[in-house]
């Protein structure tokens, strides 16, 4: 078979897999073909060994796959959340009828919501530097979902690991007390991220990752989809992150970590998030990709298209 035809067939197979991942949100594994095409980058990230963990996949292609990117970045249930996908144009024009509402869909998987609540509680315990017991977690889950506790804990643990780089560690095999292990140390003195406080440094890197994976811009819907999977909802005060809308559209925008702009030529107006100048100054696409790769137990080469883009940016910057 001619070489060009093989390439076309391979590209077609990738597109088919991407469609399947978007529909089923199964964890994508890097294929042999992708490994051959991806430049070797084993030296680009330290301590990132390949893993067969179910949380080890993030979509490979940059085409708009918001659900896949959000679900993979969040590391929780593949249930597509419709909540929080809200345009706040109504704040500027109360008469606007185009903006979708942020109502909570009754059809959402209740286990997903419980795992989100558990993630919120665990982040709070991490913030105050306290261990957590099984009994405390069962109180969050409630009697109604007690029998589903193992599944809920598994989803919450994956979310903590993939998004925030935190692992729950049982103090002893027969005990019921857990402590936290930070898999990704963002407080290294040499790191430009050392000035980021908690929880900013634990949320901003994944947010920058979602924007990068979505083609360097993410719509409100895509950002809310990601946040909803973490148990962060519009209009609800979060015990760790505070009021989420204020955090992402005001605080992080004013600090120039994010930009919040109208999508060009959108009618009715729609808004999107981009990296701000301070994000470009204090980190890079490669660092964000290395972060995502490390917490997923893989390497940046697992995302060949994004890796190539990050490499080009490094070359332009003379890194």
From Swiss-Prot:
Biased composition (Low complexity): 39-57, 67-79, 94-105
Keywords, comma-separated and alphabetical: Phosphoprotein, Tumor antigen, Ubl conjugation pathway
Coiled coil residues, start to end: none
GO terms for biological process, alphabetical: negative regulation of transcription by RNA polymerase II
Boundaries of every MAGE domain copy: 111-310
Tissues where the protein occurs: Expressed in testis and placenta, and in a significant fraction of tumors of various histologic types.
Residue numbers carrying Phosphoserine: 77, 105
Region of interest: Disordered: 1-112
A Pfam family this chain is assigned to: MAGE
Domain of life: Eukaryota
Residue ranges with Basic residues bias: 1-17
One GO location term (cellular component): nucleus
Quaternary organization: Interacts with TRIM28.
Job description of the protein: May enhance ubiquitin ligase activity of RING-type zinc finger-containing E3 ubiquitin-protein ligases. Proposed to act through recruitment and/or stabilization of the Ubl-conjugating enzyme (E2) at the E3:substrate complex.
Record protein name field: Melanoma-associated antigen B2
Species of the source: Homo sapiens (Human)
Organism lineage string: Eukaryota, Metazoa, Chordata, Craniata, Vertebrata
Gene coding for it: MAGEB2
């Amino acid at each position: 078979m001619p070489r060009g035809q093989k390439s076309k067939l391979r590209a077609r197979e990738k597109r088919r897999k991407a469609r399947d991942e978007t529909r089923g949100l199964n964890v994508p594994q890097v294929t042999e073909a992708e490994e051959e095409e991806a430049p070797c980058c084993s030296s680009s990230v330290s301590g990132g060994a390949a893993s067969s963990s179910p949380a080890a996949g993030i979509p490979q292609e940059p085409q708009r796959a918001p659900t896949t990117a959000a679900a993979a970045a969040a590391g929780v249930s593949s249930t597509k959340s419709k909540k929080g996908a809200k345009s706040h144009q109504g704040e500027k024009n109360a008469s606007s009828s185009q903006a979708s509402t942020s109502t909570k869909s009754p059809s959402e998987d209740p286990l997903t919501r419980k795992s989100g609540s558990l993630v919120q509680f665990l982040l709070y315990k991490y913030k105050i530097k306290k261990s957590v017991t099984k009994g405390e977690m069962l109180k969050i889950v409630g009697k109604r979902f007690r029998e589903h506790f193992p599944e809920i804990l598994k989803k919450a643990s994956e979310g903590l690991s993939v998004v925030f780089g935190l692992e729950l560690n049982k103090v002893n095999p027969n005990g019921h007390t857990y402590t936290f292990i930070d898999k990704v140390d963002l407080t290294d003195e040499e790191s430009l991220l050392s000035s980021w406080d908690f929880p900013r440094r634990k949320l901003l890197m994944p947010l920058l990752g979602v924007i990068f994976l979505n083609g360097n811009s993410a719509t409100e819907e895509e950002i809310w989809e990601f946040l909803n999977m973490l148990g962060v909802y519009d209009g609800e005060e979060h015990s760790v992150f505070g009021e989420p809308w204020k955090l992402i559209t005001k605080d992080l925008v004013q600090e120039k970590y994010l930009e919040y702009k109208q999508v060009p030529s959108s009618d009715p107006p729609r808004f999107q998030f981009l990296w701000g100048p301070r994000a470009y100054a204090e980190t890079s696409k490669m660092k964000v990709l290395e972060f995502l790769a490390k917490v997923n137990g893989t390497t940046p080469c697992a995302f060949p298209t994004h890796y190539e883009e990050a490499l080009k940016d490094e070359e332009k910057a003379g890194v």
